[in-house]
Swiss-Prot record:
Originating organism: Neosartorya fischeri (strain ATCC 1020 / DSM 3700 / CBS 544.65 / FGSC A1164 / JCM 1740 / NRRL 181 / WB 181) (Aspergillus fischerianus)
Gene Ontology cellular-component terms listed: extracellular region
InterPro entries hit by this protein: Carb-bd-like_fold (IPR013784), Gal_mutarotase_sf_dom (IPR011013), Galactose-bd-like_sf (IPR008979), GH-type_carb-bd (IPR014718), RG-lyase_II (IPR029413), RG-lyase_III (IPR029411), Rhamnogalacturonase_B (IPR016590), RhgB_N (IPR015364)
Stated name of the protein: Probable rhamnogalacturonate lyase A
Domain of life: Eukaryota
Glycosylation sites: N46, N351
Main EC class the enzyme belongs to: lyase
Length: 528
């Protein structure tokens, strides 16, 4: 039995629950949506511009009061309506090229969303940003302080800061799409999480990453970036983005398996229900089993991916009908590509096989995994700027095959900072014939690409890589188009005994320190 004191203390909360009623309250300027959840959630949507102006959860105001939560930097103006049908409420916000939905199910402390576009927003990116009260929600999850820029001094552009001796940026909150199912902001009594179960209309593939959270001092921002120009390798996709869900809890972290199939009954523009989709199943084979394998499908309208099981078997997510390019990755390194067609209501069987093929290896530095794994500073680069005092020296470095550690080789070389990197190796008399030096890269900046010199032989200057027009390594990105450069080494260039290779950054552009032309290494292999 509850004590009298406990009952008295509980009265305000229980009164709120008892008085809660699922529904819409309409005022001259706003719609107030009551979710009728056990931990009460009410939020207010501006009827003229679609901004969320209030989020009252469990008696606390979680919305930052200086600026609303919205698509982009706000729609400016929109046609906004709200309807209730049984246990569902739908708020629809429309402009000439964009329709945004807020959907609430009776009893759930969740704001479900979806965004349909027929043209890219004028700001050049499509995102939802929840601007939340950072007094009640100061923390960022799962990566913590790396993206808390409050009180910092800008050191690069307006998005990389120095805070208490550490470099921080909103970009350092990113996670690969294939692994990013949930990111949150939290405090001692509240947690708000963005749950992401549908990336089909986003861009960049399974390994793309973008901004997730940023406590900038005025508010704590919780994002879902559907597309942007941040190291983006694909064109933007139109159509419906989502559903995605903003989940409110008191202390626990919500699961990521949220059923949004009810969207099929809510007249959501562009929504494709499960019965109008198909799947692909099969088996991948041939790649190095020490790495995780990923299968990826994409076309101009949609993208999907999955990890394979340990035996290589896989089943895709439910896909829109159409013909797709199907890619098989060893880690993040593409080893095979084919095409497959998907039909509604059926599962297509399609196997895929591939491997990394080189030759008789003289030496290999790193692994063909599409990432700078193990190289110097690679473990830190996702979460801090290259100038950070916690980084090891960038060099220029010398790597000696057979005695150096992998961490003695830099993850990246910069034209104005640590170019060239030097490799020393010993060859036998049987290894003095013609050879190939293969230099794998993952991302370039300002036209940076490798030029190699082997003893007295100087390799050609490669053609410039495709320009992503985006800062990369300084903002925690390492993945671009993954250019691989082969240098043909004439017979007699390699000598029996000690040999020296230098790899330099070449580019017609220039820049200071870490904004000079650069590229990130994947693997360097010499073979015959």
């Amino acid at each position: 039995m509850l004590s009298k004191a406990t009952l008295l203390l509980s009265l305000p909360f229980w009164a709120r629950v008892a008085n809660a009623a699922f529904g819409i309250t309409t005022t001259s300027s706003s719609y107030v949506i009551d979710a009728n959840s056990a931990s009460p959630l009410k939020f207010t949507v501006n009827r003229s511009n679609c901004d969320i102006t209030s989020i009252n959860f469990y008696g606390a105001e979680l919305q930052y009061q200086g600026t609303g939560s919205h698509i982009g930097s706000g729609l400016g103006s929109a046609s906004v309506s709200a309807t209730q049908s049984g246990d569902y409420i739908k708020v629809t916000c429309s402009t000439s090229t964009l329709t945004h939905y807020f959907v609430v199910h009776n009893g759930d402390p969740i704001i479900h969303m979806a965004t349909h576009i027929t043209a890219e927003p004028s700001i050049g990116e499509l995102r939802f940003i929840a601007r939340l009260n950072n007094e009640l929600l100061p923390n960022e999850e799962p990566f913590g302080q790396v993206s808390n820029t409050a009180g910092g001094t800008a050191i690069e552009g307006s998005d990389v800061y120095l805070v208490n001796g550490q470099t921080r940026s909103k970009f350092y909150s990113s996670e690969r799409f294939i692994d990013d199912h949930r990111h949150c902001v939290s405090g001692s009594a509240h947690r708000v999480c963005m749950i992401l179960n549908q990336y089909e209309s986003s861009s960049g593939g399974p390994f793309h990453r973008d901004i997730n959270t940023n406590n900038g001092g005025q508010y704590n921002a919780l994002y879902w970036y559907m597309n942007s120009g941040h190291a983006q390798t694909e064109a933007n996709r139109m159509g419906l983005h989502g559903p995605y869900s903003m989940y409110f809890s008191r202390s626990g972290t919500p699961g990521t398996n949220i059923d949004t199939s009810f969207f099929a009954n809510l007249d959501i523009k562009g929504y494709v229900p499960a019965n109008a989709r198909g799947k692909v199943s099969g088996k991948a084979s041939g790649a190095d089993s020490t790495f995780k394998w990923v299968v990826h499908w994409y076309n101009d309208e949609a993208q999907y991916w999955t990890y394979t099981a340990s035996d290589g078997s896989f089943t895709s997510p439910a896909m829109k009908p159409g013909t797709y390019t199907m890619v098989y990755y060893q880690g993040e390194y593409k080893v095979a590509s084919t095409s497959v067609s998907v039909s509604a209501g059926s599962t297509t069987t399609k196997n895929i096989s591939g491997s990394v093929t080189t030759g008789k290896t003289i030496f290999k530095i790193g692994e063909w995994d599409g990432q700078p794994t193990g190289f110097r500073n690679a473990a830190n680069q996702l979460r801090m700027h290259p100038s950070d005092s916690r980084m090891a020296s960038w060099g220029p470095l010398t790597y000696t095959v057979g005695s150096s550690s992998l961490s003695d080789f830099p993850m990246a070389i910069f034209k104005s900072t640590n170019s060239p990197v030097t490799i020393k190796f010993t060859a036998s008399s049987s290894q003095t014939g013609a050879a190939t030096l293969r230099i794998g890269t993952t991302l370039s900046f300002a036209g940076g690409r490798p030029q190699a010199k082997v003893n007295s032989f100087t390799g050609p200057v490669p053609s410039a890589p495709k320009d992503l027009n985006s800062r990369g390594v300084t903002r925690g990105a390492y993945r671009g188009f993954g250019e691989v450069y082969d240098v043909a080494i004439p017979a007699g260039t390699i000598v029996a005994g000690t040999n020296t290779i230098t790899i330099s950054v070449v580019s017609g552009s220039s820049g200071d320190t870490f904004l000079s032309p650069n590229f990130i290494f994947d693997c360097v292999e010499l073979f015959q």
